[in-house]
Amino acid sequence: MSKTDKKIHVDVSRIQQIFRPDPSAVRSEQIQQLKQAIYRHRNQLLSGYLKYDIQNSDIERNPHGKPCLMAFPQLQFNHSHSRQHYALASSFELSDVGIDIEDLDRKVRFDALAQHAFHPNELKYWQDLEHDADYWFRVWTTKEAVLKASGLGIRLSLNELDTHVHPSAQGGLCHHPQIGHFAYQNFRLPDYMLTVAWRAAPSCAGFQFPQIHIVQH
């Protein structure tokens, strides 16, 4: 698999850089404050790409409910956040972009979630790898990124999608009749696992990765 001249830009920020909780606020208020802080940060980044002041009112939803900029259809974007990190993926050249980020120190019921969400092929690989945590995070973030890219989200059961994540590869292709073909690339950073996905068609010429540029703020 080789690189193309198509690009995906990824911005990663620590949540503590964009949000400081109000200690006097109750939990539900803090969650709402975090949501608004994330939206402001997203809008600021999108404004920089487009040289236009993006507001919440500019963000609409496509027929599948995926957030988009109807006034700027040339820019595809998707975002994700964990407890500690925020990530925004954007591209002017690729369609149906999706992203997921997970903290590697997240407390996870690995086996229970794998039994519930993994395709039988993924579950077998994970068991053969003696429940390797990195492989689990790669499968999980790939599922999330692909389903977010497709726009279907939870309308397609996680265990119906076989991502074909391979232990020795950092990306690949997957397909499901409901969503079509998607490609993805995994990035393991010291504190988090990040996966970017985008719509891709199989070709006799072979598959090519776009240039994915990650900026950590």
Each model region followed by its residue ranges:
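Core catalytic alpha/beta fold that binds nucleotide/phospho-ligands
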Residues: M1-H217
